[in-house]
Amino acid sequence: MTFIFNYKGKNFTEEEIVQRINAGISTESEKSIRLLIMNLSNTQLNILKPLLPDIQEICDCLFLQKYMATITLTNLLFETMVKLTLVYNEANGRTLDDGYEFENIYEKELNKYGKKNLGENIETLYKKNIITSEEHDRLIYLKNSFRNPYSHGSNNKYVESATTKLYESHLGSNEIKENIATVTGNPYLLLDARRTFIRQYGLGYFAEIVNYITTLDKDLRKLYHK
C-alpha cells in the first residue's frame, strides 16, 4: 500500500517521507524536511486565522520529533478546520458591522456544529457543496486512518496487518531463528507499530490538512470580501 500526500500541488510519496524522517529532522544535511515544516509554520490565513496557533504548535512538535504529540494535535486541527469552515460558511459574511457583539458573533453556528461529530460535519460540507466528492472521500479516509485510531486508541487497518521480526534462541545453541509475528497480541509491539506508522506518515497527514485549510480559507474569503 502506497500513500500519496498532497501539499500545495506537490505529491510526496511515503518513500520520500520515510527517507527524510529516518535521516533525522535535526541534521544539517536534511534541509528539505526542515524547509517544509518552516513553510507550514508560515501559513497565511484570513478567515480561518484562529487555526494558526495550532498549526505553529504542531510545527514545533515536528521540529522536536514528537510524533505522537503531532498526531494528537493534527487530529484536533482537522476537526476544528471542518467545524469552523461550516461556521463561517453559514454566517455568510457576517461581521461586527452587522450589529453583532464581538463575544457572540458566531455563537449560534458554534453551538450547532460543535455538537456534531467529525463524520457528520464532513457530510454537511459535501451537502453544502463546500467540498467535492473526491475531497469528501479523502477526508473520510483521513478520518478513518488517522483521526479515529489515534484519538480513540484503536487501530487502523495498516497497524492491524503490521508484522515485525522476532528472534528466538535457546541456551546451549548457536542457532538463532527468525520469526515473523503480528503486533496486535502484545501491547509493546502494538504501541510500537502505532508510533512507527506516525513517524512515517504524520508529517504528510499534517501537510495535507494544512493544504485543505488554505484552500477552504481562500473559498471563504469570497463571503467576507467587504
Regions inferred by a protein language model and the residue ranges of each:
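Intrinsically disordered, low-complexity sequence elements enriched in Ser/Thr/Gly/Pro
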Residues: 18, 113-114, 141, 145
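Amphipathic alpha-helical interface elements
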Residues: 39-117, 134-137
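...with weaker cross-activation on analogous glycine-rich loops/strands in unrelated enzymes
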Residues: 115-133
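Charge-enriched, short contiguous segments at helix-coil
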Residues: 129-226
